[in-house]
């Protein structure tokens, strides 16, 4: 399971649409998750791999009103790859444990009675354990506006601009939407904890006052700097896929969310590149099952 979908799930849990708006003042948020990607085969090249992922984050926001806020969030986690057999990417394991550390600022402000703006700059380090942080850092910016067209429907455009390791800056459009289709059905994009690269799309159904079921999907691409003592010294690893998960979320009170998810990753590909970003080898991998749990606590 990759960072961007996982952080999007956390962002969904923490979004104003799902958590009750607190009174003006300071708001503390703690969040975390664990996910497991089951072992899957690496295409025609042979070999297989599995993945375990954990993440913890902490945020502090000051709210002047439900539409005006400024905050900071910090977080970190680890993706533990476990390769088996000859992968075709490298003579041994192409990489091991991947660390992720990030900090982001979140600014939300009203433009007029119906339009709200949001700006989220971020700084991130993605590296294999032992790799240099100075060669593994990237920056990003998410910005957008949302129009409240009517009760239960908010929509608007946005843009994401993200630096990439040894590659050109990536720019992509974003659709911001929060649509109450009925009293129980909702279609929305989460804000994405830690400024993940573009929000995913989630359809939810409020089964009871405390339980919500959902379906979430997004495109994923994660790049990370490799250690100097591996098969690709100082190079770049990439994991690219399209995850789709079903979620079941329990909310015992307005400030607490616990979510369980299960699904699969489709169209996966791993890539190993040298220190300048030139591709050394690639390998597709079969559809992989994934499952896990996430929580958000807000005070």
Residue ranges and their predicted role:
Residues 66-72, 113-119, 151-157, 184-188, ...:
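Repeated loop/turn-to-beta-strand initiation elements of outer-membrane beta-barrel proteins
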Residues 20-86, 184, 190, 213, ...:
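Short glycine/proline- and aromatic-enriched beta-strand/turn motifs that initiate or cap beta-hairpins
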Residues 174-184, 246-256, 283-299:
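Outer-membrane beta-barrel "beta-signal"
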Residues 22, 62-66, 109-115, 147-151, ...:
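Outer-membrane beta-barrel strand-turn architecture
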Residues 52-58, 99-105, 121-125, 139-143, ...:
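Hydrophobic, lipid-facing positions within transmembrane beta-strands of outer-membrane proteins
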Residues 42-46, 87-93, 126-131, 142, ...:
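Extracellular loop and loop/strand-boundary signature of outer-membrane beta-barrel proteins
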Residues 91-93, 188, 202-204, 208-280:
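Outer membrane beta-barrel transmembrane domains
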Residues 32-34, 117-127, 153-163, 175, ...:
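Transmembrane beta-strand segments that form the barrel wall of outer-membrane beta-barrel proteins
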